[in-house]
Amino acid sequence: MIIVIIMPKNENNPNIKNNNHQSPKKRIALTAGTFDLLHPGHFNTLNFAKKHADELVVVLARDETVKRIKGRRPVIPEEQRKIMIETLKPVDKAILGSLTDKLEPILSVKPDIIVLGPDQTTYQLEELKNQLLERGFKTEIVKVEEYVKCPFHSSYDILKEIIRRWCNKEIELK
C-alpha cells in the first residue's frame, strides 16, 4: 500500500523547498597557465586560488598560443593538459583559452578573483586590471608572491633534468 500526502505550498513550512529562494552566490576564482609538466609551483598556485573561492576555474593556454609566446609547443597537447588539470583536487573546471583574445575566457567566466602565478608573464597585474576595466569588468586580482623553491620548481627544470639523464643514452624499455 502506498500513501501519498500532498501538502499545499506554504512559505512558512520549513519542510517545503522554496524555489524562489536563491542560494548565496558562489565565489569564483580563475587562474591561467600552460600547466605542461606539473610541478609543485602549479599546485601551490591552484591551492592558493582555491582558498580564496568556492569554485576554481583554470584557463589553459592553447598549444598555438604557447608556441607564439614561448617559441615552442607544450610537451603535452592541450586536450590532455585539460584532462589532467580537471582531475586535480582544487580544480572545479578547466577550459581552453581563446586563440584570439586572452580576456575572452575571463569575461565569459566572470570570476570574483583572478589569481596570477608568481612567474606569470602573459598577464601583468595592473595591465590586466586596466584592460578588464576598459571592457567594463572589475574584479579582484592577486599575484601569488610565494615561489615554491625545490629541485624541480618549473617545467623547464624538469625538461633539463630529463635531457641530462637521458640524452645520448640508449633508453631501455622494460
Swiss-Prot record:
Which InterPro entries does UniProt cross-reference here?
Archaeal_FAD_synthase (IPR050385), Cyt_trans-like (IPR004821), FAD_synth_RibL (IPR024902), Rossmann-like_a/b/a_fold (IPR014729)
Q: Does the keyword Nucleotide-binding apply?
A: yes
Listed EC numbers? 2.7.7.2
Query: What are the binding positions for ATP in this chain?
Result: 34-35, 39-42, 119, 147
**A family per Pfam:** CTP_transf_like
Cofactor(s) this protein cannot do without: a divalent metal cation
Reactions the enzyme catalyzes: FMN + ATP + H(+) = FAD + diphosphate
Q: What keywords would UniProt list here?
A: ATP-binding, FAD, Flavoprotein, FMN, Nucleotide-binding, Nucleotidyltransferase, Transferase
Biological process, per Gene Ontology: FAD biosynthetic process; FMN metabolic process
Q: Which domain of life is it from?
A: Archaea
Question: Do the record's keywords include Flavoprotein?
Answer: yes
Q: Name one GO molecular function term.
A: ATP binding
What the entry lists under SUPFAM superfamilies is as follows: Nucleotidylyl transferase
The pathway entry for this protein reads as:
Cofactor biosynthesis; FAD biosynthesis; FAD from FMN: step 1/1
Q: What does this protein do?
A: Catalyzes the transfer of the AMP portion of ATP to flavin mononucleotide (FMN) to produce flavin adenine dinucleotide (FAD) coenzyme.
Similarity annotation: Belongs to the archaeal FAD synthase family.
Q: How does it assemble?
A: Homodimer.
- The protein depicted here goes by the name FAD synthase
Species of origin: Methanococcus voltae (strain ATCC BAA-1334 / A3)
